[in-house]
UniProtKB/Swiss-Prot annotation:
The lineage of its organism: Eukaryota, Metazoa, Ecdysozoa, Arthropoda, Hexapoda. It holds the Pfam family IRS. PANTHER family: INSULIN RECEPTOR SUBSTRATE, INSULIN RECEPTOR SUBSTRATE 1. It comes from Drosophila ananassae (Fruit fly). Gene3D superfamilies: Pleckstrin-homology domain (PH domain)/Phosphotyrosine-binding domain (PTB). Residues 523-549, 895-915 are annotated as: Disordered. This is Insulin receptor substrate 1. GO terms for molecular function: insulin receptor binding; insulin-like growth factor receptor binding; phosphatidylinositol 3-kinase binding. The modification Phosphotyrosine is found at Y407, Y883, Y920. The keyword Repeat applies. Residues 122-236 form the IRS-type PTB domain. The modification Phosphoserine is found at S284, S285, S340, S548, S904, S907. A motif (YXXM motif 2) lies at residues 639-642.
Length: 940
């Protein structure tokens, strides 16, 4: 060894070069005023003495790290790491190692003190070649680097130029925190070491693949870096707090890291051959001491099984094995929840010997207890919260789960079976614990609520009620029961909307419109629409609808006007009308007749019609001219079904077409008429008017000896002039003037003013010829009463007005016209407010003199071939359920001019029969909806 000379030489001697293992003469110089501190080596000492040029000069100021290297097969190696690469010296003994290493570090510190540089104290430095794989090429970290490990980070320092041959930039130096490394491993045959970085690393998430000089270096890198990641040194434990400017709390353990890798990210050679023999490794670094850092495995987590924990082994404190138990105050049963290695797996790595993944291993030589005895409990994974936050395990048993052990009662009173586990009995019905008393809900009510028959209808599951809920529900149903008391045997019912139970659904109005007899002087709008009987038109057992939604206040629902916006149908059956005495006739009729009655529409007050009855026969009988049905209706209440023609469906055995009857009215009263003039402005050809003389008119009228029992069909141009003399004596007459009314079946009628009503229908051209032949047979029938035939048509009619000039001209010709198609009778009953009054002849009345009757009959006009201008048919968008107001004699108390309705395509035919006394009806649709505009009643 050469002595220290005046030029600053400190040490010299023969040592081996690590790369070639050849002996070289090394000379160490300190810093002088002339030269810097440096390390030189020569081939031989002779060349050094001859002042030959050294083989290599390494300046200590360029070395960022000088330390001992333990990853080689040589025991005493010192490595000087610089940007030009690493240089290793193999010494002969430990003493030589200590002497040279201490002198090198002393010179380095002196340089750092002089220049103000700070050198990092790297524990391990490996020279690696980062392959162009994974994320390396993207981030620009490829080529030869120094991999420097410290207690908190892993630093890569570039070796060589900062640009590649292709001109790409290289990262000169970068530091990666150990906490951002997800996992690491090595592959021995290929001398490959790799590691996966997380998203929080400075390079982002990805993998780095590095090639080492030999497989031993790759293995050493894996073990050393994994030990550093798992170490529990003070600097590493509180690394996150220090970096985030938080206080250094050394007694708090670091949080376990979560697994973020999957099997697909592992290399193929690493995944293979996972089952190998157990291998225990010793610590390879003197700096690996202390407790290992708690960290979760890098691979995807899964819940371990009991078989895995049963295969765990005991390991002494002298083995550097990674502990996966939770430290602190948590019990040791809260062990690692995933990926515990089995007995036959290598403990140095969860992977094979050739591919060792950092799962459950550590190079720490620290002492820790036997944690592997029961690393997997049967209670599943334990959360990382403190024990104070854990749920109470009062009902958890150590044995296997059972139905009673794992059940936590939810009853207000804890059953005795949970207080005494040995006595497990089912509660008895008389158990006092089951007697739950609640205010306003007695136990009897609760017992009645649990009725299986009421809830188990149609095989449905039993509904669960809250305490006392069903009791109030049943009370509400009882209070509302009379609103919907039909269909008591329904199994499943549909629900009403909120507040709709008190009203009849509109669909019921479209199917059938019925009102019960007013026998008890109650409001008809409150009666049920479904009544048992052959005329009901609907099913007799209608299902009661449930009220699933909360109903509105009962006070608002049950009122007298809850159906005021709907139609009104009033059919009552009354007793026979008592005849008027002469005093009553004079007081009610004669004294109130206006003087000028020609320009005023006749009005009448409505008599009591509470006992009126309607009877109907089929429409076929009307067309065929059959006899009228004079028997009383078999229905209980005398209902008349109002229904659209043709399209609506009826489930009643008595269908609508069978109920389209002809109307027969029998008037038992005889009307003393002094003079009756019928003014009409029908478009009758002039030649027919000339043929009809007053003599012929009187002859034809005398042949009609039946009782006047027809409805007077007054058009707008037909003004009724009745001059009644109060002083005319009252006469008795047994004669009955029968006027047989035929049907006006012409589509071209011409109507005049709007003073009276006429029920107008038109007939299509296809049916006209058939009906015309049937009417001839109908005229031959000398039956009492009159008929109103309604025929559905394809178009509607509209009235047209005629000027005053035509009206005056028609008044002069009114006595010359008699038709065979229309027979008119008085339309209004005697009234105190009428401007024109008509009277029927009856058996029980005193009749006026014969000349009065003759004068009356002379003025009754029967028109033929009425031609009205047809109006366009109704729009197709109008509904087929029509509303109308039909005022018959002795029934109306309204001015018909107020109820002018427009015709539509179809209208429900109406028919009545005459029985005892005057039988009339009132069909009132005054307050119907917009569809009421399609009525068939015209104000003529």
């Amino acid at each position: 060894m050469a002595s220290i000379s005046d030029d600053g030489m400190v040490l010299s001697g023969y040592h081996k070069k690590l790369k070639t293992m050849k002996k070289k003469f090394f000379v160490l110089y300190e810093e002088t005023s002339i030269n810097q501190a440096r390390l030189e080596y020569y081939d031989t000492e002779k060349k050094f003495l001859q002042r030959a040029e050294p083989k290599r000069v390494i300046y200590l100021k360029d070395c960022f790290n000088i330390n001992r290297r333990l990853d080689t097969k040589h025991r005493f190696v010192i490595v000087l790491s610089s940007r030009e690469g690493g240089f290793g010296i193999v010494l002969e003994s430990e003493n030589d190692l200590r002497k040279w290493l201490d002198k090198l570090l002393l010179l380095q510190r002196n340089i750092a003190n002089v220049n103000g540089q700070v050198y990092s104290a790297y524990e391990h430095v490996w020279q690696v070649i980062i392959q162009k794989k994974g994320m390396s090429e993207k981030v620009g970290i490829t080529g030869t680097y120094h991999c420097c490990l410290s207690a908190k980070s892993l630093t890569f320092v570039c070796i060589g130029p900062e640009k590649t041959a292709n001109g790409d930039d290289r990262i000169s130096s970068i530091e990666i925190l150990l906490t951002t490394i997800r996992r690491c491993g090595h592959a021995s045959p290929q001398c490959i070491f790799y590691m996966e970085l997380g998203r929080q690393s400075v390079l982002g998430s990805g993998e780095l693949w590095m090639e080492t000089d030999n497989a031993a270096i790759a293995t050493n890198m894996h073990n050393t870096i994994l030990s550093a990641m798992s170490a529990k040194t003070d600097s590493n434990t509180n690394l996150i707090n220090v970096y985030q400017a938080r206080p250094d709390i050394s007694h708090e353990p670091m949080r376990k890291r979560s697994s973020s890798a999957n099997e697909a990210s592992k290399p193929i050679n690493v995944i293979q051959n996972r089952q190998n023999s157990l291998e225990l490794r010793n610590c390879s670094s003197p700096h690996n001491y202390g407790f290992p850092r708690e960290r979760c495995d890098s691979l995807p987590t899964r819940n371990g099984t009991l078989s895995e924990s049963s295969n765990q082994s005991y390991f002494g404190s002298n083995l550097g094995l990674r502990s996966n138990t939770i430290s602190g105050i948590r019990p040791h049963s809260t062990s690692k929840h995933s990926n515990s290695p089995t007995f036959n797996m290598p403990l140095r790595c969860s992977e094979s010997e050739d591919s060792s993944i950092s799962i459950d291993e550590s190079d720490d030589n620290a002492s820790f207890g036997h944690y592997r005895l029961n690393t997997r409990s049967s209670k599943g994974a334990i959360p990382e919260e403190n024990l104070d936050d854990f749920a109470s395990a009062e009902y958890c048993k150590g044995s296997g789960p059972s139905g009673d052990d794992n059940y936590i009662p939810m009853t207000p009173i804890k059953p005795a079976s949970f207080c005494e586990p040995d006595k497990v009995e089912l509660p008895k019905p008389d158990d006092p614990n089951l007697h739950i008393n609640f205010p306003e809900h007695t136990s009897e009510k609760l017992e009645n609520d649990f009725d299986l028959d009421s809830d188990n209808q149609c095989g449905r599951p039993i509904r669960a009620y809250s305490i006392g809920n069903k009791v109030e529900h049943l009370k509400l149903n009882r209070r509302l029961g009379y609103l919907n008391d039909t269909g008591q045997n329904s199994n499943r019912v549909r629900a009403y909307s909120v507040g709709s139970k008190s009203k009849i659904p509109r669909c019921d109005l479209q199917r059938v419109v019925l009102v019960e007899d007013n026998r008890f002087d109650t409001n008809r709008s409150q009666n049920n629409i479904s009544k048992e009987g052959p005329i009901s038109g609907t099913s007799t057992n209608r299902e009661k609808k449930s009220t699933s939604a909360p109903l509105l206040s009962l006070k608002n629902q049950i009122n007298q006007d809850r159906m005021s916006d709907l139609m009104e149908i009033d059919f009552s059956q009354s007793s026979k009308i008592e005849p008027w005495t002469p005093a009553q006739f004079k007081r009610n009729v004669m004294d109130v007749v206006p003087k000028n009655i020609e320009s005023v529409f006749p009005k009448s007050y409505r008599n009591d019609s509470s006992n009126l009855t309607l009877h109907a026969t089929s429409q076929k009988d009307i067309f065929n001219g059959g006899k009228l049905n004079t028997t009383e209706s078999s229905s209980e209440g005398g209902y008349l079904e109002m229904k659209p023609v043709g399209n609506a469906f009826s489930s009643s055995p008595v269908t609508l077409p069978s109920k389209i009857e002809k109307l027969k009215l029998k008037d038992n009263t005889e009307l003393p008429v002094h003079e009756l003039h019928k003014v009409s402005s029908y478009n009758i050809p002039p030649e027919k008017r000339k043929e009809q003389t007053p003599t012929q008119t009187r002859i034809e009228e005398k042949t009609l000896n039946s009782q006047l029992n027809e409805k007077l069909i007054n058009t707008e141009s037909a003004n009724v002039v009745a001059n009644i003399t109060p002083n005319v004596p009252e006469l008795k007459s047994d004669k009955k003037n029968n006027v047989e009314s035929l049907i006006i079946e012409n589509n071209n009628w011409d109507l005049g003013t709007t003073d009276e009503k006429k029920l107008v229908h038109s007939i299509s051209s296809e049916d006209y010829t058939q009906i015309k032949d049937k009417l001839n047979d109908l005229t031959k029938n000398n039956e009492v009463g009159y008929k109103i035939l309604q025929i559905k048509s394809d178009s509607s009619l509209i009235s047209s007005k005629i000027t005053l000039k035509n009206r005056l001209r028609d008044n002069l010709e009114r006595q010359q016209r008699l038709t065979e198609s229309v027979n008119t009778i008085p339309d209004k009953s005697p009234s105190a407010t009428t401007k024109g009054t008509f009277y029927s002849l009856g058996n029980n009345f005193q009749t006026p003199p014969n000349n009065v009757v003759n004068n009356t009959l002379d003025n009754i006009l029967q028109t033929k071939d009425l031609n009205f201008p047809s109006r366009p048919s109704s729009q197709a968008s109008q509904p087929e359920l029509h509303y109308a107001k039909l005022d018959l004699p002795n029934c109306s108390d309204q001015n018909p001019a107020k109820y002018l309705k427009r015709g539509s395509r179809e209208s429900p035919p109406v028919a009545t029969c005459a029985e005892d006394g005057n039988t009339y009806a009132r069909i009132d649709f005054d307050q119907s909806d917009s569809s009421s505009s399609s009525s068939k009643i015209f104000n003529m």
